[in-house]
């Protein structure tokens, strides 16, 4: 069996996904998104978290049709956006990192820096999936950002990125229905926070 380039052993948590809502927008390759996630704690309490981030992405699609006088065009750049309400169908799983030996996640493990990836496709209505690594080490994150800022230290930043991803307390995997100004598909990676 081949080893993943960034091994992060995960197990299912006793926290359960309840629902989520969110939205995002892209202009050319720049992306931003945010939302709300509701989880059921092992004690049976609904706990809400907010998240947001900025990043970059790629997409493949066709030009959106013109709606009356509304033309979603920014001089030579593609623009898109989609969102999901809690009422729309969605599903998810909460995973805990093996590094939390002998215990499950606590509320504090979820908050702090996070990295996430979103994949989506649709024609007005569509579907999307999100994978969030949460509870990243903030000191490692700052070190990776500094090291990656210069071509002279980029190799150091790349090796520290592996440590940063392995510092994660867990992961959230979510998928659901969305609606918006979309006519194709795309993927984006974000750096943000869960709070």
From Swiss-Prot:
Q: What are the leading ranks of the lineage?
A: Bacteria, Pseudomonadati, Pseudomonadota, Gammaproteobacteria, Pseudomonadales
User: What keyword terms does UniProt attach to this protein?
Assistant: Host membrane, Membrane, Secreted, Transmembrane, Transmembrane helix, Virulence
Main location, first listed in the record: host cell
Transmembrane segment boundaries: 20-40, 116-136, 140-160, 171-191
Knockout phenotype, as recorded, reads: Deletion mutant together with deletion of its cognate immunity protein Tsi4 leads to a significant loss of fitness advantage when placed in competition with parental strains.
* Record function comment: Toxin secreted by the H1 type VI (H1-T6SS) secretion system into the periplasm of recipient cells.
The subcellular localization recorded is: Host membrane; Secreted
Q: Mind telling me which GO cellular component terms the entry cites?
A: extracellular region; host cell membrane; membrane
Quote the protein name from its UniProt record. Answer: Toxin protein Tse4
């Amino acid at each position: 069996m081949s080893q993943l380039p960034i091994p992060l052993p995960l197990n299912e948590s006793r926290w359960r996904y309840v629902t989520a809502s969110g939205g995002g927008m892209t202009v050319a390759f720049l992306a931003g998104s945010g939302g709300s996630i509701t989880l059921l704690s092992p004690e049976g309490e609904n706990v809400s978290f907010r998240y947001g981030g900025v990043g970059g992405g790629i997409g493949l699609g066709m030009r959106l049709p013109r709606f009356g006088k509304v033309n979603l065009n920014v001089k030579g750049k593609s623009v898109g956006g989609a969102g999901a309400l809690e009422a729309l169908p969605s599903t998810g799983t909460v995973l805990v990192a093996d590094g939390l030996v002998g215990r499950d996640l606590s509320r504090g493990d979820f908050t702090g820096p996070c990295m996430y990836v979103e994949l989506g496709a649709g024609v007005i209505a569509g579907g999307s999936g999100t994978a969030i690594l949460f509870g990243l080490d903030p000191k490692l994150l700052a070190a990776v950002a500094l090291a990656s800022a210069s071509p002279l230290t980029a190799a150091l930043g790349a090796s520290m990125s592996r440590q940063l991803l392995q510092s994660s307390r867990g992961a959230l995997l979510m998928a659901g229905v969305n609606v918006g100004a979309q006519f194709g598909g795309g993927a984006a990676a974000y750096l943000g926070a869960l709070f």
